[in-house]
């Protein structure tokens, strides 16, 4: 029977595959080629596909103290890529804690996985936890899409998430590096970052980012600040302007809401509004491919 990983991403049955569940419930199958071995720490390298870029030193220290008291209850999982050289598949936090304790060797289970399987296991294992930042989560989604040639919709179905969730995370990757770094460092929240997306202008985005950090703006204050900037950026209306009917306002708002729904679904739609004496003009560009 195929395990969770096989069902999600279509790999064949292998005795060396393992269930991707929450770490507290993860069960490593005790099958052939999976006996626990003591591997020198100097021969182990972190997973190159690890989506987590920031490790909380305090949390690692706490884990190290727990391991010192109770031992390493669950071995790390690795794969061999050269003679006596191993790459972590799962358990980098445990590996870091063991290193902090000064261990020379660490208990490990060796798995026979290729690059694609190794990357996918590392990404999914981390996605199942709540400790990833929004940017790390977005990077993980993007890598899975690229590894398995998936659409956002297909990835959402396989991970049991809404497509809008995937789309909203991926939109964060289009922000400037300074904003993504602020998210990684938790200087701002995901909602702060998402509020910056409509600005489009990178200079304005960075200006507001600085205000958020320096003035400690909450999300509501940030949204109000951005709304003001967007209003100021609109073309100045002519002094003499005919009154706009209620039906016209409703029609315009309906179109704007529809465009936002399409954008939230992951489709990169561009639109431009122009106002003339007798009518409004909305130009919409919809890509043929996502």
UniProtKB/Swiss-Prot annotation:
One of its GO terms (molecular function) is DNA binding. It is found in: Cytoplasm, Nucleoid. GO terms for cellular component: chromosome; cytoplasm; nucleoid. Keywords: Cell cycle, Cell division, Cytoplasm, DNA-binding, Septation. Residues 153-172 bind DNA. The keyword Repeat does not apply. One of its GO terms (biological process) is division septum assembly. Signal peptide: none annotated. Effects nucleoid occlusion by binding relatively nonspecifically to DNA and preventing the assembly of the division machinery in the vicinity of the nucleoid, especially under conditions that disturb the cell cycle. It helps to coordinate cell division and chromosome segregation by preventing the formation of the Z ring through the nucleoid, which would cause chromosome breakage. HAMAP family: ParB_Noc (MF_02015). Belongs to the ParB family. This is Nucleoid occlusion protein. It comes from Bacillus cereus (strain ATCC 10987 / NRS 248). The lineage of its organism: Bacteria, Bacillati, Bacillota, Bacilli, Bacillales.
């Amino acid at each position: 029977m195929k395990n969770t990983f096989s069902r999600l991403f279509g790999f064949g049955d292998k005795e060396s595959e393992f269930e991707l569940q929450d770490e507290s419930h993860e069960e490593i199958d005790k099958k052939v080629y999976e006996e626990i071995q003591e591997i020198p720490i100097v021969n182990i390298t972190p997973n190159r596909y690890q989506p987590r870029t920031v490790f909380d030193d305090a949390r690692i220290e706490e884990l190290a103290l727990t391991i010192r008291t109770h031992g390493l209850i669950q071995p790390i999982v690795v794969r061999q890529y050269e003679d006596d050289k191993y790459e972590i598949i799962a358990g980098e936090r445990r590996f870091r804690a063991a290193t902090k304790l000064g261990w020379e060797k660490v208990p490990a289970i060796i798995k026979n996985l290729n690059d694609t399987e190794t990357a996918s296991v590392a990404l999914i294992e981390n996605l199942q936890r709540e400790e990833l930042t929004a940017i790390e989560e977005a990077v993980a989604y993007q890598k899975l899409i690229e590894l398995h040639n998936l659409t956002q919709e297909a990835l959402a179905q396989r991970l049991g998430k809404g497509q809008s969730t995937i789309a909203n995370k991926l939109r964060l990757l289009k922000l400037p590096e300074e904003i993504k770094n602020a998210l990684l460092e938790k200087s701002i929240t995901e909602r702060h970052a998402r509020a910056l997306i409509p600005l489009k202008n990178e200079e304005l985005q960075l200006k507001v980012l600085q205000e958020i950090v320096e003035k400690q703006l909450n999300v509501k204050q940030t949204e109000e600040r951005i709304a003001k900037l967007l209003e100021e950026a609109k073309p100045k209306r002519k002094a003499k302007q005919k009154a706009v009917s209620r039906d016209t306002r409703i029609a315009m708002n309906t179109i704007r809401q529809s465009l936002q729904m399409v954008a939230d679904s992951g489709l990169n739609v561009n639109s431009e509004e122009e106002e003339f004496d007798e009518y409004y003009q909305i130009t919409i560009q919809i890509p043929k491919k996502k």
